[in-house]
């Protein structure tokens, strides 16, 4: 793939986000993205930062593997250092999830709780967006989310816009390299972040 093509494609996505915000009847003042330490959320958050609009990135660990959490914190730090329009907030969600599962202990179901983690994150993203006159920007790609349907309904699928919805995983990796995403993130095998 030619470098110019990758750059042009990234700019098309950046312009698309800006055009969406400019043409929406509700004029969003911020873009809110949950970051996991994976390539999809890293690319989307970097595209958002490149719009020049206020970009709020949230790390929301719930029983998360330390290496994934470390990658998300590293990416957030990189974004803040590179883009003056980026804010990062670490929202520890273990207590919220523990309270949720304690209240519902007689309805214990591992898969249900895994999906509930994604739904708690979605509710958090929308609360932050509401408090900042923003929109929630999704991180789903063409193959996993919009092809196979590998997402949590009303969880990570609950977003306002999905800039990489038409990108294959290979294209997401290409954009990540072009945008300067850390090799540690690019080389990490994808996970769903649910377990």
PLM features: residue spans?
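Catalytic subdomain that performs nucleotidyl-dependent activation
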Residues: 135-195
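ATP-dependent adenylation/nucleotidyltransferase module used to activate substrates
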Residues: 1-150
């Amino acid at each position: 793939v030619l470098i110019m093509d990758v750059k042009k494609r990234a700019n098309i996505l950046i312009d698309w986000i800006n055009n969406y915000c400019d043409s929406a009847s509700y004029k969003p003042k911020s873009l809110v993205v949950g970051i996991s330490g994976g390539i999809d959320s890293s690319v989307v958050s970097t595209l958002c930062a490149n719009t020049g609009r206020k970009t709020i990135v949230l790390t929301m660990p719930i029983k998360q593997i330390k290496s994934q959490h470390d990658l998300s914190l590293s990416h957030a730090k990189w974004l803040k250092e590179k883009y003056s329009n980026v804010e990062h907030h670490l929202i520890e969600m273990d207590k919220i999830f523990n309270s949720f599962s304690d209240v519902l202990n007689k309805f214990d179901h591992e898969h249900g709780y895994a999906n509930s983690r994604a739904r708690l994150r979605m509710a958090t993203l929308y609360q932050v967006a509401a408090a900042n006159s923003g929109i929630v920007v999704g991180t789903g790609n063409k193959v996993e989310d919009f092809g196979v349907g590998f997402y949590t309904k009303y969880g990570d699928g609950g977003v306002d816009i999905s800039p990489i919805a038409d990108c294959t995983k290979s294209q997401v990796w290409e954009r990540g390299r072009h945008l300067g995403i850390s090799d540690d993130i690019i080389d990490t095998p994808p996970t769903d972040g649910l377990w």
